[in-house]
Amino acid sequence: MGWMQILKASLDIITSELRQDVKSMGGKIYQIGGAVRDEFLGKVSKDLDLIITGIDIEDLQELLNKHGKVNLVGKSFGVLKFNPTGEKGEPVDIVVPRIEVSTGEGHKDFEVKLGKDITLEEEQLRRDFWMNAIAKDIETGELVDIEGRGQLDIKNKQISVINPKAFEDDPLRMLRAVQFAARFEFKIEEETMKEIKKNAQKIKTVSNERFQEEFRKMFEKSLKPTIGVKLLVETGLMKHILSNGKVNPLMDKLDKNAFPAFLALFGEDSSSEKLQDLMKLSNKDAKIVKAVMDFQKLDVNDLNIVRFLSKMTDKSDIIRNIDALQKAKNQKTLSEQLKSMKSEGKPTNLKELAVSGQDLLDKGLSGRKVGEILDFLLELAVKTGKNDEDFLLERAKSKFSGELWKSILKKQYNIK
């Protein structure tokens, strides 16, 4: 299915009855934002952001309740989540026009006003970039693009801010500009670039969660995320984000499911703890990032691989991210190395060792020594490629031949 068919199928959930009810109340339904922009770019958009003008939010909520399930998730921001009757998918975001009036310094100090008297143009002018402010009447297909600025920017492959104060009001928009530049391989328009440089230090006021979301998009939705990382340096944002953050060409070769590997490259001259603080990473993701960073410093051989993985939880995710980085380097992946070890009869972990902890306990060995002996046997099996119970136990007897082994013999053979 092409993007036009997908777009049409998405709009079909706004039934003719709903459209007629909106029209009878003096309202109009428009698509706005990413879906319209992506239509010009020939890309499939998962977003179906709709805006309904000319109706107060309370009346709109009442109207939508007749056609499905509606939740008011942000009355102060005029956001409704709508599931039409019979539809089981994700709800559609429907908003009413709003304006934001600054009440002080900082992007948190503003008052939101919404209502049927606020026009579509006022809504468009409060958005971040011209390419994201194009609206489309879903009835007629007519485009509403102030002075054609949005289409012009898309044609010229550039990102320009609508209001120079936008970065003061919400500094995250600076990172969004960088993210879009990387994602679409657009340039940032000259005046917009100046405004970002002027306000760069304000990026420190952005919450870690919002920062991570935008940074993740820059990696996952870009063919060349290095475009974005280079722009972080060029705009001056980098020194306020991670002073020693790095641009690494391997970033462009990583699998898009390997965000921790991307972070490991980005922060390779920093620490996983700093990255965790910067991005508010989950403990799991932070451990994966640290593991990838540690593996890059490892003298890779069979024994060191086994030692390395023996300390890890979430091994499958760690291996997947290390694999992604090794593929980017055109190196043999960790998965391939582990497969080779198994084919040579070498255990890659204690579970694969021919002697278990229970085997040692059954022979009368003290529990506190079991771990020490198992570690010795695992290393021995990896070094020699001999993962055989008799061989391993014989070597254990030689290694631990004092009073410790006598206690085993005493129990096994009733020696006094």
Segments (PLM) and residue ranges:
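Catalytic cores of the polymerase beta-like nucleotidyltransferase superfamily
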Residues: 1-416
